[in-house]
């Protein structure tokens, strides 16, 4: 973890030098993973959709945590599962409109692979660490690649809209979006035309984007899983501006500002209105005194996975609110993993409330003056400069995301999961996994009792219980676990049933 202060910060990485006598790292200025991992390291039932460049699916750190659409055929030009997308075995390329995810365009930066590594690189395998990537023995969360950038192409309005809906419809509960429009208060000399001024303007001029995000936040997840609804996480932007960029600044989203290894705002981060929470994003200009040549300041950035066509080692440093964003996505994924393992259920709003309430307060560190170096592109040299931290006090959202406090809160909140009411087509079947609704369910056995077996019957096949619809009507039923827990539920059989199984 020496290079990953963002996950475990011992406060000893950036000690004083001749050029910089003040330590620029603080113990615990990370996302508090170390203690959280004692509770959970991730769960494969949680899917994170990465809307970005394509994620390198063959990377040794990521390949075991790539989402697979089991009902699709790799490389197929036919829509085998009927979801409207052909060949979407690991996600979909919304740039080329195919199921072939790419990460090797000459102009690709590895951005999508880098953010994916922060969330779900596999731990304890000799490579890097991640927030929710699990271990070789305990699989972590899954990454669904929704490709909206490819080299110099992509990133248009409709590709992101389609990707957001695709993610909701195919099982993702978290949107990881390290992109957005320029802040509405950005300096026009440096950044060109400012972006949307407020949420009303964004809703008026980008209505399909708003509708897609509403769709995700309300329709992702399940009323019978750890979360009903979805969490859309966006970068606040890198324009040094005093308001976050949209779509992240919209009320249904989580907008993430960036911090350095001492809890201070990253020099480039957007902040203020629209900003919800902070996370480590790296700050190369702040750590310019550390390292030599091309390596200057690198250690103050975020270390993660990269495609091998971008980095010969498969790893590298990046910075930005783009890198802060996946820390929040990763902590949300870790929290939902723990909720799934503890069989706790939340609405999306309830979960976001816990995310905010458990953040680490950081205003005590945002005082005085912060000195850094900034490259002046119009002048062609690096210029020493400073920022008044008082401008950022109370403006970095609720504080820094805290995995351990979130997981502790999850154990004390939400509602217990219940075996769901079933909706079965006449002469059809619905397959259930009862272990997912009972604490420590994998170690239990189950007995189903159906009051009216003329309406429906059940049979057990390994870990599955399969229900068959025999006659139109309804009946009460119960499922008893070997630990003494019993859940009551209803079964309805209809000709018009969709076969989804859940009422």
Which positions does each model-derived feature cover?
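Primarily auto-inhibitory N-terminal propeptides
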Residues: 1-21, 34-37, 165
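Surface-exposed intrinsically disordered loops and tails
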Residues: 10-29, 67-85, 90, 96-107, ...
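Catalytic-core segments of hydrolase enzymes
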Residues: 49, 115, 173-298, 303-304, ...
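Hydrolase catalytic cores
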Residues: 118-119, 144-150, 165, 173, ...
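Extracytoplasmic soluble-region selector
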Residues: 412-503
